[in-house]
Structure formats: C-alpha cells, structure tokens
Amino acid sequence: MRALLSRVTSASVSVAGEVVGALDGPGLLVLLGVHAGDGAEQVATVVRKVAELRVLRAEQSVAGTGCGVLVVSQFTLCGDTSRGRRPSWSAAARPELARPLVDAVVAGLRDRGVPVTTGVFGADMTVASVGDGPFTVLVQA
C-alpha cells in the first residue's frame, strides 16, 4: 500500500464537475494506492502514519490538531515504470479487493477522531489542492 501525503491549505475532489469531498482548511491530501496482497497490516500502518506523522506546521499531526484529511483512491500509485515506456498496473489490487481496504483506511482514521472526506472509488476525478510548503511524503506499507 502506498499513501502519498501532501500538506495542504485546502483541497477538493470533484466528479463530473461536482465537488464530492473537500478540505476548507489546513490538513492532508492523501492519494492512496492499494497493491495486490495488501491487507489489515498495511491498513493499520497507513492509518497510524497518516494520523500520527508530525508533518503539519509546528511539527503537529492531524490526530493532534483536528485538521482534516482528504483521501482519494489512486491505483496509479502502484504503477511500475521500470521497463519500457508504458507503466504496468499489474501490482495494483483489483477493484473488488482494493475498495474494502480503502474503506478500512477511512474508517480507521475516523475511529481515531480524524475528520475525513473522500473521493469516489473508481470514478474519474478532478483533484485540486493548494500545497503548503510544498511538503509531500510517501508512506509505503
């Protein structure tokens, strides 16, 4: 599982021109890719890292500040570009396996009291964000 965390001052995700999830203040935009073979252990690691990493201003975490998280599923994070000119997506989990794990990450963050908003799994989405820093870090579980 890969989670690309970007510190933002605001972010939103739209489907067919309609905003379906947004952060109106500071927080984290989390692009989440699920690999084939991922499970509960990877979910727990990503939830812990997203909630507890001190990546916000003043070395704060989202769990410690109440800042929100916008989670957007993105299978392309599992792409392999090591050969040729076209990425391979073979490492990505199939949608029927990935969706419950994305939902589990969202539920795990909410269980920790983190305000979470999301995109729509599998939809063609437009993601907008205003980066803060910029500060982006990759979590691999």
Question: What residue spans do the PLM features occupy?
Answer:
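N-terminal, polar/charged subdomain of small-to-medium soluble alpha/beta proteins
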Residues: 1-88, 99-141
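An anionic oxygen-ligand recognition environment, strongly enriched in 2H phosphoesterase
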Residues: 91
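Short, surface-exposed ligand-recognition loops at beta-strand->loop->(often short) alpha-helix junctions
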Residues: 96
